[in-house]
Design a protein with these regions (language model features):
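A generic, well-ordered mixed alpha/beta core segment in the N-terminal half of proteins
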Residues: 97-101, 106-112, 117-121, 125-129, ...
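Active-site/acyl-donor-binding loops of N-acyltransferases
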Residues: 125-144, 225-233, 237-346
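Conserved GNAT acetyl-CoA-binding A-motif
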Residues: 94, 101-114, 244-257
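Conserved acetyl-CoA-binding loop-helix of GNAT-fold acetyltransferases
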Residues: 77-80, 86-99, 124, 230-244
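Amide-forming acyltransferase catalytic core, primarily the GNAT-like/NAT-type
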Residues: 129-232, 236, 241, 257, ...
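An acidic- and aromatic-residue-enriched active-site/binding cleft used to recognize and process polar
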Residues: 61, 78, 114-117, 216
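Short amphipathic alpha-helix that is part of the acyltransferase structural core
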Residues: 1-60, 67-74, 140-181, 217-220
Length: 347
């Protein structure tokens, strides 16, 4: 959304300056983001006085809901020049991106808030806490069964690594955001350049698993991202290798779901019918009649819905006993209890 006369090159240069002022990222990261993530198609921005003063990027993703694929969006880089804040600029961009996602057929939108202080701002536009995350201790006994694995650090992206990653995401129960080959390659490159580890485990000549590890040298903790659900020989071998490389460090794996308690990400339902259809397919035992109200941005989301036998139907008239739900209550219901694979790739 372009409201000024900057050339495309001037626009991107101004947007990069605004990004650096707001987020303090390194030049290397900014170069990577604007070369491999940013495009004019995902850009929402406002120009004033010959420069970009407010912006966000709405990145498209595919998402699995219990094995069924839907479209989703992720809001990245929401920022406003300090001189133009409290004028509703960022809010107008968020509202426009939400409306556009609905028109494109997206079921959900996501974002990672910079802190608890911005949650009230995003609630105005229908974003509510949906995903909590915690770092849980990993206990490594040193006993490995099921075969001997050779563990080596990956030094660059490989198609083998991507295939393992894609398979792990598709095997997860609950909700999972999927990442394209190019998105994953971007993350791998940035992860390695940032001094982090990607360990791979090989049984014989076959690479069977991987582990993303971020060392925190101040806390002396190794954080594991996107850990496999099972704790097999490959996992134990990689944990042992990581601890051998960083003796004396604790090791923790990030988890989401009912055991997690730290606010991590917010979700916005952009299509109630599709969201409830996905929920119904994942919960065939659910039998309920819901009246959804209060969505001022997407009024078509408001209405009467019946969830039964793994399906969702919509009624144009009030018939029967419906449970009234706000968008916030519906978001909590859909994401409560189910694990959401929403990992480091978006941080």
């Amino acid at each position: 959304m372009d409201n000024s006369k900057l050339t495309p090159g001037e626009h991107v240069a101004s947007l990069r300056r605004l990004w650096k002022e707001c987020f303090y990222d390194t030049d290397e990261f900014i170069d990577m983001y604007f070369t491999r993530v940013y495009s004019p198609q995902v850009d929402y921005s406002i120009e004033r006085g010959g420069r970009v003063v407010s912006a966000l990027q709405c990145l498209p993703y595919n998402m699995l809901c219990g094995g069924n694929a839907v479209l989703a969006g992720y809001l990245s880089g929401v920022c406003t020049d300090a001189s133009y804040r409290r004028q509703g600029l960022a809010g107008s961009l968020v509202a426009q991106s939400v409306a556009d996602m609905h028109r494109r057929g997206c079921t959900f939108a996501f974002l990672i808030p910079s802190g608890s202080e911005v949650l009230p701002f995003y609630r105005q536009y229908g974003f509510y806490i949906a995903i909590r995350r915690s770092a849980m201790p990993i206990r490594h006994s040193g006993n490995v069964t099921g075969g001997t694995c050779t563990v080596t650090p990956a030094t660059a992206y490989s198609d083998v690594l991507y295939r393992l990653f894609a398979r792990r995401q598709r095997e997860r129960r609950g909700y999972a955001l999927l990442h394209s080959r190019e998105q994953f390659k971007t993350v791998v490159d940035d992860w390695i350049k940032g001094g982090n580890l990607i360990l791979t485990a090989r049984l014989g000549k076959k690479t069977v698993s991987y582990l993303f590890v971020r060392p925190d040298n101040e806390k002396k903790v190794l954080y594991v991202y996107d850990a496999p659900a099972g704790r097999d020989a490959a996992f134990a071998s990689m944990v042992g290798q990581a601890q051998g490389m960083y003796p004396g460090y604790d090791m923790r794996a990030y988890i989401t779901g009912h055991r997690a308690h730290n606010t991590f990400a917010c979700a916005r339902i952009t299509d109630t019918s599709k969201a409830l259809a996905a929920y119904a397919a994942m919960h065939p035992e659910a039998d309920m009649q819901i009246s959804v109200s209060g969505d001022k941005l997407i009024e078509s989301n408001n209405g009467f819905y019946t969830v039964s036998h793994g399906q969702c139907t919509r009624s144009s008239a009030h018939a029967g006993s419906f449970t009234a739900m706000t968008l916030a209550q519906l978001t909590r219901m859909i994401f409560s209890g189910d694990k959401m694979s929403f990992n480091f790739l978006l941080e």
